[in-house]
Amino acid sequence: SIIDYIERKLGLKVNMTKTKVCKPNELKYLGFGFYKHSKYEVIPHEESKKKFKRKLKGLTKRSESISLDKRFEKLNWLIRGWVNYFRISKMKTFLKSIDEWLRTRIRVIIWKMWKLPKTRALNLMKCGINKDEATRAAYSRKGYYALARTFQLGSSISKRRLSKPNKTKERRGLVFALDYYLA
């Protein structure tokens, strides 16, 4: 058999727990999976995607009280590392959905940091939202996540604002996975 040939002729040890014969789309190898379009192509395996999302979720817990700068630094480190490792694979759609989800979570964190309705209204007005809309959002009874997906927060805490460094250049902006992947 093949195992005898590998062990006797080549002098290699075969690990039976790791060795298997299967179709490429059933295989996970170093975090990568494979799928067949017209030919087999490389993608991040589903388990790798779930692990990445779980790590992002851990860094964007709203109960964790760390500064936004430190949070962005950790997120940038994680996103760059993951995208660099899986760069050879096709993952544009996955990264687009991750970026949308991450922006919503960041908006929730910022909304919670502003705490008081008065502060929220003032900060929304600073971001260019008119007074009526800002007041309506600030005094809303909706939950954090529902408010993070509204027009007021989506346009005031936009992708452009999140990725832009602050005025003192102490904080670099947030790196978005899809932009980094396509660059």
Segment roles from a protein language model:
Residues 1-183:
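Non-catalytic terminal/accessory segments
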